[in-house]
């Protein structure tokens, strides 16, 4: 049986937030997603970084860059999920700033 859990965490209250999704089957992580987004002064949400498995492997969508490149994470999924959580906590301000610079101005 697959168990799913979704939760959010404020990185900078109330503007910047992270949303996490984790899907576990028989004790193994089978799917995961992390999204970093912020709300602008008009109430519009902007996603500036995302990790998911939409192309088969867990990878990072660098939405804060002009070309919106992808970084592949080759660690086992549970470990990669924790690495991505740490990356977002440590770098969200830089990612948000890059998104604003490259996409809103």
Language-model features, listed with the residues they occupy:
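Mixed-charge, Lys/Arg-enriched low-complexity segments
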Residues: 54-105
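Negatively charged, low-complexity tracts enriched in Asp/Glu with abundant Ser/Thr
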Residues: 1-39
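A short, structured beta-strand/loop element
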Residues: 28-69
